From Swiss-Prot:
It holds the Pfam family BacA. Bacitracin is thought to be involved in the inhibition of peptidoglycan synthesis by sequestering undecaprenyl diphosphate, thereby reducing the pool of lipid carrier available. GO terms for molecular function: undecaprenyl-diphosphatase activity. Belongs to the UppP family. InterPro entries: UppP. PANTHER family: UNDECAPRENYL-DIPHOSPHATASE. HAMAP family: Undec_diphosphatase (MF_01006). Its main location: membrane. This is Undecaprenyl-diphosphatase. It is found in: Cell inner membrane. It is an enzyme of class 3 (hydrolase). Catalyzes the dephosphorylation of undecaprenyl diphosphate (UPP). Confers resistance to bacitracin. It catalyses: di-trans,octa-cis-undecaprenyl diphosphate + H2O = di-trans,octa-cis-undecaprenyl phosphate + phosphate + H(+).
Amino acid sequence: MLFDIFRAVILGVVEGVTEFLPVSSTGHLLLVGRFFNLGEDSFWKSFAVLIQLGAILAILSIYFAKLWRIALGMFSDPAARRFVIGVLVAFLPAAMIGAVAGSYIKLYLFNPWVVCFSLIVGGAILLWVDQLDLNPQQHDATAFPLPMYFYIGCAQCLAMIPGVSRSGASIVAAMLFGADKRSAAEFSFFLAIPTMVGAFVYDFYKNRGEMTTDHLTIVAIGFVVSFITAVIVVKTFLGYVTRHGFELFAWWRVIVGTLGLIALAMGR
């Protein structure tokens, strides 16, 4: 039990740190899970999804005032209503593909080799886009054009491949379609809410009968750790990318992916 608590804390930290950075939380959790020899254990696979609720609540707590204002104005304020529609438009492509092909993606693509290659390729793309002279025209994540929300949602579908990164795909797409770095990152936070809530509800419902009291305790620990870590990371991340961009995270992806491939080639 103590070792399970230790693993829950480590995985909670990994989830909280990586969920909103463009480095792929799923990819990092798969690699850390391999280090802990979690293998095909169905509980730990579900654990990785369930502790995302902590990260979701971190976003809700940080942006509570803004989201509450949007919710209250949804029926009276055209701008608020338009943003809600935009988030739904961005969410739907991934929701539809996940419903149709989610089980096949997990079966065939959830392995460390795919993660490492995706980390490297995604890192190279992020580095390239970060260094482009894009002359951004969109500076408010709640006021993008509706077609732009849809394009970002389509790009997010690529993140179903482990190692691509949900936030990374949406940030790159947002920047290519005219968003500045801060608003691109901020919209990736907002888009995470329906995407991650959907994954959480689906996984919890599917595995509700298999959860023991010990399992719930472990999940609760991971949840609290991921919440605290995510709050710290999100508050730091926006200021950092506004000043320095995404180069650090791009190189992090390339280095982790390369080291992972070396370890896999050595049979680790």
